[in-house]
Amino acid sequence: MKFRPLHDRVVVRRIESEEKTKGGIIIPDTAKEKPQEGEVVAVGPGARDEQGRVNALDVKAGDRVLFGKWSGTEVKIDGQDLLIMKESDIMGVVAL
């Protein structure tokens, strides 16, 4: 199934953090926090302004982004755990 978000919504796949610390200690799933970094999978066309014009989003598919701990709504699409959030929930794009 292909999913296209509406308006200023963005679909993000979380990027999982390391399973092990630098010192070699393995972190169990129960002690891990949900990652706040992800890859943009799909973007909507943008929000409309008062004149009805569509304002394009600043992020695009493939961007690596940072977002808040409680941002977005968790969904499962084609067996993948994804987040749908507004572009305003994204704090920034990570330059690689």
Swiss-Prot record:
Q: Which GO terms describe its molecular function?
A: ATP binding; metal ion binding; protein folding chaperone; protein-folding chaperone binding; unfolded protein binding
Q: Which SMART domains match?
A: Cpn10
Q: Which GO terms describe its biological process?
A: chaperone cofactor-dependent protein refolding
User: What are its GO cellular component terms?
Assistant: cytoplasm
Keyword Cytoplasm listed? The answer is: yes
> InterPro entries per the record?
Chaperonin_GroES, Chaperonin_GroES_sf, Chaprnonin_Cpn10_CS, GroES-like_sf
A Pfam family matched by this chain, by name?
Cpn10
Q: Which family does it belong to?
A: Belongs to the GroES chaperonin family.
Q: What does this protein do?
A: Together with the chaperonin GroEL, plays an essential role in assisting protein folding. The GroEL-GroES system forms a nano-cage that allows encapsulation of the non-native substrate proteins and provides a physical environment optimized to promote and accelerate protein folding. GroES binds to the apical surface of the GroEL ring, thereby capping the opening of the GroEL channel.
Protein known as? Co-chaperonin GroES
Q: Which gene encodes it?
A: groES
